[in-house]
A protein has these predicted regions:
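Catalytic core of Fe(II)/2-oxoglutarate
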Residues: 161-233
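Non-heme Fe(II)/2-oxoglutarate
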Residues: 1-87, 108
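Catalytic core of non-heme Fe(II) oxygenases with the double-stranded beta-helix
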Residues: 103-181, 214-220
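Short, cationic low-complexity segments
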Residues: 39-41, 141-150, 224-233
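Short proline/glycine-enriched turn/loop segments at secondary-structure junctions
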Residues: 3, 110-111, 193-197
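A structural signal for short, well-ordered beta-strand segments
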Residues: 98-100, 121-123, 204-208
Length: 233
């Protein structure tokens, strides 16, 4: 009798956070104000979402209006680590940067990864059911035994696949609702659907880094920052 074994999964954490309408409205207005005060609008291309980290607003975790949100995110990060059986007591966790994104009409976010951090989050502060969904892309493609098999438009058009599922796909379209939080490795390539109409979709992104509390016997992990020495350049 045949058996199929699936190894090396990508684990994405999803949870719904509890925020009052007043809290959410205050954060939404704060994000809209940031958009009005953009410092780098030449960087924003047509049909691309507004991203606060490129406009001078990359430290939402230090903004008191977002305090409760980041407290809840903190707790969810610890739950994520528990699911991977990571002893977080041996690690120092830092919010490295955090920002808002605004998608209007057919604006989208190109596929990308956050290579300067370890974990990333996406929280949906304002989202309608029909707004664009997040997509995750598989850069390993362990099952793609023929080069370009999974991503070829011509092969898909020729019905080379009887059906598409997680075993033979190089991307996943993942549905979320307002108040949902996602946590995933920062190296994961992700973006949003293109050509979808958005009713001012507002999400909060954040990057998290991990440092060893004590690196005295460790070959890997980033050592404690208090032992670093800054260059005089």
């Amino acid at each position: 009798m045949q058996k199929i074994f699936n190894f090396f999964p990508l684990t994405v954490y999803k949870s719904s956070l509890s925020l009052s309408d007043n809290e959410k409205n205050e954060m939404i207005e704060e994000v809209r104000l940031m958009e009005k005060k953009s410092k780098n609008l030449d960087y924003k291309s047509p049909n691309k979402a507004w991203t606060g980290d490129t406009q001078g607003f990359e430290y939402l975790h230090n903004n008191l209006k977002f305090k409760n949100l980041f407290t809840q995110i903190n707790n969810c990060i610890l739950e994520y680590l528990e699911n991977l059986s990571i002893n977080h007591k041996k690690l120092d966790l830092y919010f490295q940067r955090s920002w808002a994104t605004i998608s209007k009409n057919t604006e989208h976010i190109d596929s990308h990864s956050h290579d300067q951090s370890h974990l990333s989050i996406a929280f949906y502060l304002k989202k309608q059911k029909d707004d664009a969904k997040i997509m995750f892309f598989d850069s390993s493609k362990h099952n793609e035994f023929i080069p370009q098999l999974f991503g070829s438009r011509s092969l898909a058009k020729d019905n080379i696949f009887k059906k598409r599922d997680i075993l033979n796909s190089s991307r996943v379209v993942f549905d979320t609702n307002e108040d949902d939080l996602l946590i995933f490795p920062s190296k994961t390539i992700h973006g949003t659907e293109q050509g979808k109409s958005n009713s001012e979709r507002i999400s909060i992104s954040a990057d998290i880094v991990f440092l060893a509390k004590d690196s005295s016997t460790l070959e890997h992990l980033v050592p404690p920052v208090e032992n670093w020495k800054k260059f005089s350049n």
